[in-house]
């Protein structure tokens, strides 16, 4: 292929698209670059496997540490399992890509995005999303694109396209918008309690930039003489399809019209209809065209039955403005909440129920040393808030092997984490590392937003002083032609058979997280805006129910949580606290039973099983790092004796000398006549000489001063 390069500029920030240079055997290849961040994206297609009734699309995002001039850690010095961030970027690429493939496509498709060079200020994720579209188009795969993505930041009052890491950190918004010529396809955002209207304007602003990238891809295809692939869907047997529809439509319509609130009852009724049709096919003659067609296409019954159910469910919503469980379009399912559902050895817990969706959230408070250290290409080095999401098979009444968390679980945990980070207390006010685990015990839609709600309550139960509580709701969409219905608090069947899953989380002040996924090729900005606005009253209703259970964070943490105290020292004194080879800090730990974490800034966090131990360690460190003044009185221990005096350690790591003339108010012939190694003595700082040597005395100490020194040690 001829080598071609395209440049697109946004406010002086260029994106370079290069094709024809790399990976010539891949179906489609593009190198996409901005600054020094370069991502190679390939798309490859293979023939459909027999018996597949879904699109086997596999998207992998990979990072190479050489991209940042680093060698991997570990014994092998080689990249291993992709970090969580790579999994999230894989999902970010997949989500806007998947709905643009024709629904009938069954070919194996693999998209691989590899970051080959990393600019410490330019994120690679949105480049990878746009690059995936170019690669798929070049691979000549049927695709309703082009598609592109940009990031929108908010610094001050100004929106920025593709902000740097520094601008993202300094701003109040981190939003990714992906779109096609038909409209918005995907939105992912974290925000600092931003008003709905500001978020809507940001999406609008971002989509305008997306359109520029779409035009650039169209121009690129024109230059190369490549047209979008038009391919007809495989033929279907109308005889079999009509047989199934004739026997399914009436009973399915009747079942949906019952407005059954229990999904298990509704699903069982639908399964009975499906089983009856299957039995009717089996009872036909072996030579009957319907039975012959069914034998050739084992998935025909399931697929057609799903289409019938989908059509009738959607028609019921469009024509009757009523949902399968009888709710109005903007009605939230019944909500109930409990806090403290687990014993207090669990530092905080809550159970959140919304309809048949039930999430148990549990909080663990840890020490700064429990923070997650990140080893990837991204600038964050550690995380003090961790949110993990588990979705066991029993939550949907199924059986399957339970393995390590999948992409969906990692993604849902990250969404809940993003929703809550903006309301966490600053580290200097609440130094704990916080881990929340959301266990989905029952699922009928919107478990990620159930995790947000349950986790808010569990954090409050744990005594975490959130600045504001967060609630979340999932919005859905039914679109037939020009008719559009937005659904509040969607359940499983509405997610499965609907066109959109739009999760919105936030406080009463604004949005903290968004995630929108589509099943159609694009959505107008007007409908996106309506969905965001319609979510607010739902969120406020849910929040009201939550606060009826627990109105504010508890004043005390669990008695089983570690006790933490903070202390700030001069960074130049860190070496004094640590001591040679860590001797001093180890000694404090052994003496008090406390754990001590020291940051380069001089911030020290002391943790212990009870507060007295932590305070004792703080007292020792405060004593050894405070500036000494002549006249200060301490309790010390004689460490060694020389002919002219005795050395006394009066603070950890601090020694001074009592000259023989300062041991007593009478003549002392030998130091050993007055003190021995190991003796406890009361000393006063006499002077600190020009070389920093501390001279001590036992003379002139008032009884009150001695008593105060002993009391300080006892405390």
Swiss-Prot record:
<dbReference type="InterPro" id="IPR003029">
    <property type="entry name" value="S1_domain"/>
</dbReference>
<dbReference type="Pfam" id="PF03725">
    <property type="entry name" value="RNase_PH_C"/>
</dbReference>
<feature type="binding site">
    <location>
        <position position="501"/>
    </location>
    <ligand>
        <name>Mg(2+)</name>
    </ligand>
</feature>
<keyword id="KW-0694">RNA-binding</keyword>
<keyword id="KW-0460">Magnesium</keyword>
<dbReference type="GO" id="GO:0005829">
    <property type="term" value="C:cytosol"/>
</dbReference>
<keyword id="KW-0548">Nucleotidyltransferase</keyword>
<comment type="function">
    <text>Involved in mRNA degradation. Catalyzes the phosphorolysis of single-stranded polyribonucleotides processively in the 3'- to 5'-direction.</text>
</comment>
<dbReference type="InterPro" id="IPR012340">
    <property type="entry name" value="NA-bd_OB-fold"/>
</dbReference>
<dbReference type="Pfam" id="PF00013">
    <property type="entry name" value="KH_1"/>
</dbReference>
<dbReference type="InterPro" id="IPR004087">
    <property type="entry name" value="KH_dom"/>
</dbReference>
<keyword id="KW-0808">Transferase</keyword>
<protein>
    <recommendedName>
        <fullName>Polyribonucleotide nucleotidyltransferase</fullName>
        <ecNumber>2.7.7.8</ecNumber>
    </recommendedName>
</protein>
<dbReference type="GO" id="GO:0000287">
    <property type="term" value="F:magnesium ion binding"/>
</dbReference>
<dbReference type="GO" id="GO:0006396">
    <property type="term" value="P:RNA processing"/>
</dbReference>
<dbReference type="InterPro" id="IPR004088">
    <property type="entry name" value="KH_dom_type_1"/>
</dbReference>
<dbReference type="Pfam" id="PF00575">
    <property type="entry name" value="S1"/>
</dbReference>
<comment type="similarity">
    <text>Belongs to the polyribonucleotide nucleotidyltransferase family.</text>
</comment>
<feature type="binding site">
    <location>
        <position position="495"/>
    </location>
    <ligand>
        <name>Mg(2+)</name>
    </ligand>
</feature>
<dbReference type="GO" id="GO:0003723">
    <property type="term" value="F:RNA binding"/>
</dbReference>
<keyword id="KW-0963">Cytoplasm</keyword>
<feature type="domain" description="KH">
    <location>
        <begin position="562"/>
        <end position="621"/>
    </location>
</feature>
<dbReference type="InterPro" id="IPR036612">
    <property type="entry name" value="KH_dom_type_1_sf"/>
</dbReference>
<dbReference type="GO" id="GO:0004654">
    <property type="term" value="F:polyribonucleotide nucleotidyltransferase activity"/>
</dbReference>
<dbReference type="InterPro" id="IPR012162">
    <property type="entry name" value="PNPase"/>
</dbReference>
<dbReference type="InterPro" id="IPR015848">
    <property type="entry name" value="PNPase_PH_RNA-bd_bac/org-type"/>
</dbReference>
<feature type="domain" description="S1 motif">
    <location>
        <begin position="631"/>
        <end position="699"/>
    </location>
</feature>
<dbReference type="GO" id="GO:0006402">
    <property type="term" value="P:mRNA catabolic process"/>
</dbReference>
<dbReference type="InterPro" id="IPR020568">
    <property type="entry name" value="Ribosomal_Su5_D2-typ_SF"/>
</dbReference>
<dbReference type="Pfam" id="PF01138">
    <property type="entry name" value="RNase_PH"/>
</dbReference>
<dbReference type="Pfam" id="PF03726">
    <property type="entry name" value="PNPase"/>
</dbReference>
<keyword id="KW-0479">Metal-binding</keyword>
<dbReference type="InterPro" id="IPR027408">
    <property type="entry name" value="PNPase/RNase_PH_dom_sf"/>
</dbReference>
<dbReference type="InterPro" id="IPR036345">
    <property type="entry name" value="ExoRNase_PH_dom2_sf"/>
</dbReference>
<dbReference type="InterPro" id="IPR015847">
    <property type="entry name" value="ExoRNase_PH_dom2"/>
</dbReference>
<dbReference type="GO" id="GO:0000175">
    <property type="term" value="F:3'-5'-RNA exonuclease activity"/>
</dbReference>
<dbReference type="InterPro" id="IPR001247">
    <property type="entry name" value="ExoRNase_PH_dom1"/>
</dbReference>
């Amino acid at each position: 292929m001829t080598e071609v390069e395209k440049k697109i500029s946004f406010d002086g920030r260029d994106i370079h698209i290069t094709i024809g240079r790399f990976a010539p055997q891949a179906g489609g290849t593009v190198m996409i670059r901005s600054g020094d961040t370069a991502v190679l994206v390939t798309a490859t297609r293979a023939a459909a496997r027999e018996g597949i009734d879904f699109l086997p699309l596999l998207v992998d995002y990979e990072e190479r540490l050489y991209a940042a001039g680093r060698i991997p850690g570990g014994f092998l010095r080689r990249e291993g399992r992709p970090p969580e961030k790579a999994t999230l970027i894989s999902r970010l690429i997949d989500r806007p890509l998947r709905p643009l493939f024709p629904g009938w496509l069954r070919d194996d498709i693999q998209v691989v995005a590899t970051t080959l060079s990393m600019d410490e200020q330019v994120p690679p994720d949105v480049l990878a999303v746009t690059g995936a579209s170019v690669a798929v188009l070049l691979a000549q795969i049927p695709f309703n694109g082009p598609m592109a993505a940009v990031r929108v930041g908010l610094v001050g009052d100004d929106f920025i396209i593709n902000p740097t890491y520094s601008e993202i950190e300094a701003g109040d918004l981190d939003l990714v918008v992906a779109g096609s010529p038909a409209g918005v396809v995907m939105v992912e955002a974290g925000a600092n309690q931003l008003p709905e209207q500001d978020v809507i304007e940001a999406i609008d602003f971002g989509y305008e930039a997306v359109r520029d990238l779409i035009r650039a891809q169209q121009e690129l295809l024109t230059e190369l003489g490549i047209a979008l692939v038009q391919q007809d869907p495989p033929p279907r047997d109308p005889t079999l399809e009509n047989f199934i529809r004739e026997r399914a439509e009436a009973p399915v319509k009747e079942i949906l019209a019952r407005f059954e609130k229990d999904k298990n009852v509704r699903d069982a009724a639908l399964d009975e209809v499906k089983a009856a049709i299957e039995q009717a096919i089996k009872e036909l003659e072996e030579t009957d065209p319907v039975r012959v067609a069914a034998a050739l296409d084992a998935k025909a019954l399931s697929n057609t039955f799903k289409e019938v159910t989908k059509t009738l469910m959607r028609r019921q919503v469009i024509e009757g403005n009523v949902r399968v469980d009888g709710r109005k379009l903007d009605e939230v399912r019944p909500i109930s909440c409990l806090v403290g559902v687990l014993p207090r050895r669990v530092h905080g817990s809550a159970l959140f129920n919304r309809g048949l969706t039930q999430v148990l959230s549990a909080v663990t408070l840890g020490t700064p040393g429990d923070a997650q250290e990140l080893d990837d290409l991204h600038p964050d080095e550690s995380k003090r808030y961790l949110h993990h999401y588990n979705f066991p098979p029993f939550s949907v009444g199924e059986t399957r092997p339970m393995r390590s968390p999948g992409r969906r679980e990692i993604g849902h945990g990250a969404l809940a984490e993003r929703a809550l980070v903006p309301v966490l207390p600053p580290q200097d006010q609440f130094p704990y590392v916080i881990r929340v685990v959301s266990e989905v015990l029952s699922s009928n839609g919107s478990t990620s937003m159930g995790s947000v709600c349950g986790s808010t309550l569990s954090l409050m139960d744990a005594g975490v002083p959130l600045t504001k509580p967060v609630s979340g709701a999932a919005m859905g969409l039914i679109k037939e032609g020009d008719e559009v219905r937005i659904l509040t608090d969607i359940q499983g069947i509405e997610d499965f058979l609907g066109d959109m899953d739009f999760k919105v989380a936030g406080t009463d002040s604004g949005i903290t997280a968004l995630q929108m996924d589509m099943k159609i090729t694009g959505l107008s900005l007007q409908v996106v805006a309506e969905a965001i606005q319609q979510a607010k009253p739902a969120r406020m209703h849910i929040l009201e129910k939550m606060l009826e259970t627990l109105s504010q964070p508890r004043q005390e943490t669990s008695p089983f949580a570690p006790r933490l105290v903070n202390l700030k020292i001069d960074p130049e004194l860190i070496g004094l606290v640590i001591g040679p080879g860590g001797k001093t800090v180890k000694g404090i730990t052994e003496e008090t039973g406390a754990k001590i974490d020291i940051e380069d800034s001089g911030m020290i966090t002391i943790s212990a099983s009870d507060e007295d131990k932590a305070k004792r360690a703080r007292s020792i460190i405060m004593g050894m790092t405070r500036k000494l003044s002549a006249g200060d009185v301490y309790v010390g221990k004689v460490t060694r004796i020389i002919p002219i005096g005795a050395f006394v350690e009066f603070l950890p790591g601090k020694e001074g000398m009592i000259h023989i003339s300062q041991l007593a108010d009478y003549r002392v012939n030998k130091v050993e006549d007055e003190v021995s190694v190991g003796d406890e003595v009361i000393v006063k700082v006499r002077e600190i000489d020009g070389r920093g040597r501390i001279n001590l005395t036992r003379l002139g100490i008032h009884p009150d001063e001695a008593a105060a020194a002993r009391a300080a040690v006892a405390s």
